[in-house]
């Protein structure tokens, strides 16, 4: 078995697609329930009030409101603060 490849051959030339991780909704943005807030590997951000965590550590909104980033016990958290609608 040859261990040297022939001319004009290469063992390189492959790459994997990016995972599109990161913050998807920023502080102050108004979101609906179910919207993805942060895509992450591990818990860089922890779920706070009205925020759920998926099996792949994705954070999503459980209720409509405004996104708020904060910290609790030294951990970065993401909260959803209800937005008061003007009475019509």
From Swiss-Prot:
Please provide, in alphabetical order, the Gene Ontology terms of the cellular component aspect for this entry: cytosolic large ribosomal subunit
Q: Which Pfam families match?
A: Ribosomal_L27
| GO biological process entries | translation
Does this entry carry the keyword Ribosomal protein? Answer: yes
InterPro entries with a match to the protein in the record: Ribosomal_bL27, Ribosomal_bL27_CS
Write out the coiled-coil annotation as residue ranges. none
Q: Which GO terms describe its molecular function?
A: structural constituent of ribosome
**Which keywords does the record carry?**
Ribonucleoprotein, Ribosomal protein
Q: Does the keyword Ribosomal protein apply?
A: yes
| Stated family | Belongs to the bacterial ribosomal protein bL27 family.
Task: List the protein's name.
Answer: Large ribosomal subunit protein bL27
Query: To which species is this protein native?
Result: Mycolicibacterium smegmatis (strain ATCC 700084 / mc(2)155) (Mycobacterium smegmatis)
